[in-house]
């Protein structure tokens, strides 16, 4: 295609290598390193099953990793047929055909456990939500995790209809 006399030459190269911010952003993933998002939340590709959840937990920074391992163990111990997945950079736990009952997410100073039908749990987890049924339980560094209470919540939550996105 011929250019007219007043046409500007293209400043775009035909085959430009990835450079700049975009290349730096992609580089860690090439090397197999996990990118930590805002608040230190691991960026794990979405996927079903235990493997992506374990990858998420392994990538949790510092003291939060131990909390992730303990939460996962409590859930598996109390709901042996639990279904696991990583969605929206968070591990999800559910029952096949019933939906998701629990998720957790890493923030800068705490790990937030989400009970999708938490308003129906007894006692009700303390963290409120703008969603009527959802309740949260935040775990901060140095907090003692009451595994017995967490197990009671997990059993109750797994018995309820779950959240289906």
Sequence positions of predicted segments:
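Charge-dense, helix-prone N-terminal extensions
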Residues: 2-165
């Amino acid at each position: 295609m011929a250019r007219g006399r007043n046409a500007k030459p293209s400043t775009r190269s035909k085959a430009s290598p990835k450079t700049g911010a975009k290349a730096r952003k992609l580089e860690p993933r090439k090397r197999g390193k996990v990118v930590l998002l805002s608040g230190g939340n691991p960026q794990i590709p979405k996927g079903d099953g235990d493997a992506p959840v374990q990858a998420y937990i392994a990538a949790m920074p510092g003291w939060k990793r131990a909390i992730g391992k303990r939460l996962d163990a409590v859930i598996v111990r109390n709901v042996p047929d639990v279904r696991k997945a990583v969605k929206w950079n968070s591990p999800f736990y559910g029952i096949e055909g019933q939906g998701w009952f629990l998720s957790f997410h890493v923030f800068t100073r705490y790990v937030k456990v989400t009970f999708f039908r938490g308003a129906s749990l007894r006692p009700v987890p303390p963290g409120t939500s703008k969603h009527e049924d959802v309740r949260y339980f935040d775990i901060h560094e140095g907090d003692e995790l009451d595994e017995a209470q967490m197990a009671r919540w997990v059993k109750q939550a797994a018995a309820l209809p779950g959240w289906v996105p």
